[in-house]
């Protein structure tokens, strides 16, 4: 296997800038061999994004280390990319392009592939005219000989492709609505959180399944829905694409239906990697809540602080005390070692806003329905009738009691 050597560069506005070189490294390592990371604190330079002196310094490092690709943690304009590639004499991409390449690698289903293509085209659209302008100057490979008419044709071609993909995704969304309608009789729990927080491992722990969980970012792009085991109620849990800082609006839009599948549930499990540095946990919690707010998530939340097996009591107290304002119904668990998983299941039940109803009936169809669709708490046989106490969603309890009242 040929290793492609990468150099990582990040420009920060100031020391308080929350952009993370560690996160960029974690992303890059999915596809490349990282040879070095470099940070510069300064205001953005219109020509290079970073300062010209820093560019010269990095050019020498690229040559000396035989670097194949330079990856920026900042969004680059086509002109900046061209200027940097001219100086480094290797390919230059930014963080968004890197994420799109990772998405492309992991997109296995038709929907995921369409979502990735949509994100790629929406990334390309505002850059199209500038890329063609460079081509007209003979400075952009693959775009030679473009006139004004061709520029507009290229731009309109991208817009048509975007429209076509959106139509295809809309049809898939309608199919998803049908599936969701079928599942409405079940309680639903969504797994959300920063990429690589351990959502898939938690899914396995709660469902008793063994979906492959890699220690790598963005391995889950499609939704996976399973039934939680060890609970009498039929509760479905859905895992989907992880969140990330600096995700542009077009990327959230491309994966909106997938994100909504997890976010619009009766209950949300917001999964956090508790083993990380306290500042990193805070940064990711802020991102999580920002994205949930963007998609107008109104669901009840349990904050699941995963990987508790890697931290001590002091760290647990530090998290609870310093990050209290971000923690909604917190619980420490280890999905890997099943620590506090049963306690989490109880919390799930307690936070589903369920109601309890009691009916007296001798109707076998109703009895069968209750056993299939609700959680039976008690069933007492008396005078050839069943006095059944059951638990379900409040609207379902009210509906069952109303129907039973009409029948009697």
Question: Which residue stretches match the model-derived regions?
Answer:
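N-terminal accessory targeting/assembly segments
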Residues: 1-101, 403-404, 408
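Switch I (G2) and immediately adjacent beta-strands of P-loop GTPase domains
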Residues: 44-51, 55, 218-246
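Short, acidic/turn-prone active-site loops that include or flank metal/cofactor-
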Residues: 96-100, 217-218, 335-336
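Flexible beta-alpha connector loops of hexameric P-loop NTPases
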Residues: 13-15, 45-47, 210, 241-251, ...
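Switch I (effector-binding) loop of TRAFAC-class P-loop GTPase G-domains
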Residues: 181-187, 205-233, 249-257
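Conserved C-terminal guanine-recognition region of P-loop GTPase G domains, centered on the G4
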Residues: 23-27, 59-60, 76-86, 256-328
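C-terminal-of-GTPase-core extension/linker across diverse P-loop GTPases
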Residues: 2-8, 125-197, 203, 293-408
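Short alpha-helix plus adjacent loop in nuclease-associated cores
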Residues: 98-116
């Amino acid at each position: 296997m040929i290793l492609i050597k990468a150099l990582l560069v990040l420009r920060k506005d100031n020391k308080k800038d929350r952009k993370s070189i560690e996160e960029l490294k974690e992303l890059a390592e999915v596809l490349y061999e990282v040879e070095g990371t470099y940070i510069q604190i300064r205001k953005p330079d219109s020509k290079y994004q970073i300062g010209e002196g820093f560019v010269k310094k990095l050019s020498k490092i690229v040559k000396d280390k035989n670097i194949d690709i330079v990856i920026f943690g900042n969004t680059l304009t086509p002109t900046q990319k061209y200027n940097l590639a001219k100086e480094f004499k290797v390919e230059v991409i930014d963080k968004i392009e890197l994420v799109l390449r990772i998405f492309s690698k992991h997109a296995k289903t038709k929907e995921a592939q369409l979502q990735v293509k949509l994100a790629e085209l929406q990334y390309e659209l505002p850059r199209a005219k500038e890329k063609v302008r460079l081509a007209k100057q003979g400075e952009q490979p693959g775009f030679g000989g473009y006139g004004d008419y061709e520029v507009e044709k290229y731009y309109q071609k991208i817009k048509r492709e975007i429209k076509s993909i959106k139509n295809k995704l809309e049809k898939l969304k309608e199919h998803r609505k049908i599936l969701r309608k079928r599942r409405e009789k079940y309680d639903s729990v969504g797994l959300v959180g920063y990429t690589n927080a351990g959502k898939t491992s938690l899914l396995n722990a709660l469902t008793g399944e063994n979906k492959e969980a890699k220690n790598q970012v963005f391995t889950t792009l499609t939704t996976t829905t399973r039934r939680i085991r060890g609970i009498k109620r039929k509760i479905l849990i859905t895992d989907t694409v992880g969140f990330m800082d600096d995700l542009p609006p077009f990327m959230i839009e491309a994966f909106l239906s997938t994100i909504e599948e997890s976010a619009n549930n009766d209950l949300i499990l917001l999964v956090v990697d508790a083993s990380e540095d306290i500042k990193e946990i805070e940064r990711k919690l802020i991102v999580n809540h920002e994205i949930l707010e963007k998609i107008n998530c109104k669901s009840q939340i349990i904050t699941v602080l995963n990987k508790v097996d890697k931290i001590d009591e002091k760290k647990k107290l530090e998290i609870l005390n310093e990050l209290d304002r971000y923690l909604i119904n917190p619980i420490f668990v280890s999905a890997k070692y099943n620590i506090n998983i049963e306690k989490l299941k109880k919390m799930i039940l307690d936070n589903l806003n369920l109601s309890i109803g009691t009916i007296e009936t001798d109707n076998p169809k109703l009895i069968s329905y209750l056993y299939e669709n609700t959680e039976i708490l008690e069933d007492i046989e008396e005078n050839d009738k069943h006095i059944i106490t059951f638990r379900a969603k409040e609207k379902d309890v009210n509906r069952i009691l109303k129907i039973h009242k009409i029948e009697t």
